[in-house]
């Protein structure tokens, strides 16, 4: 019996297998690749601010709020819990804190924020933020950006309550998990 044609396929099959193994071994899996881009997030929240006077010219507000955000893609439809401090010293105010957010399936992202120094009654305040961590598809998130806080244009319904309305613009980079 002759094995016609089988021998002529052994060498090309060997090379195909070798090339496929090398290519698949070199290409990083999708889970190790980085996702990165720009983002635009609209954020709205409500909460409380507890004031403590710590001297003749210094007042500190402890801020605690819950909110939600919508975005242009990444981090869309998130709920957030934010905490921070607003310090008013000698007619100059500045706020800083952090927010932890969760998406619809439970992935979390965390960022730190800090406002510019501003007048206490200033209606619109600018600031910066930095991504500092996350879980799930946001694990390892990094990046930063700016925000514009329009909260001073709104009046809360009750004393001691605060409302927030901010627009964030920035960048992110995170390992892909999909």
Please state what every model-predicted region is.
Residues 4, 24, 29-32:
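Glycine-centered signal
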Residues 1-11:
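N-terminal secretory signal peptides that target proteins for export/translocation
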Residues 30-178:
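Beta-strand-enriched cores of mature, soluble protein domains
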Residues 5, 15-17, 169:
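Compositionally biased, low-structure terminal segments
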Residues 12-25:
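Bacterial N-terminal signal peptides
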Residues 1, 17-18, 121:
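Compositionally biased, intrinsically disordered low-complexity regions used as flexible
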């Amino acid at each position: 019996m002759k094995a016609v044609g089988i021998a002529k396929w052994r060498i090309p099959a060997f090379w195909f297998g070798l090339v496929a193994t090398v290519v698949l071994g070199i290409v990083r899996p999708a889970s190790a690749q980085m996702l990165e881009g720009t983002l635009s997030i609209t954020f709205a929240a409500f909460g409380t601010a507890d004031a403590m006077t710590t001297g003749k010219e210094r007042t500190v507000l402890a801020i605690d709020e819950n909110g939600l955000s919508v975005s242009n893609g990444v981090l869309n439809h998130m709920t957030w819990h934010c905490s921070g401090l607003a310090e008013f010293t000698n007619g100059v105010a500045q706020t800083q804190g952090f927010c932890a957010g969760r998406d619809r399936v439970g992935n979390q992202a965390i960022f730190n924020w800090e406002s510019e120094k501003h007048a206490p009654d200033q209606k619109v305040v600018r600031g910066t933020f930095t991504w500092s961590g996350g879980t799930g598809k946001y694990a390892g998130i990094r990046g930063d950006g700016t925000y514009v806080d329009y909260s001073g244009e709104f009046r809360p319904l009750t004393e001691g309550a605060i409302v927030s309305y901010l627009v964030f613009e920035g960048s992110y980079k995170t390992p892909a998990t999909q």
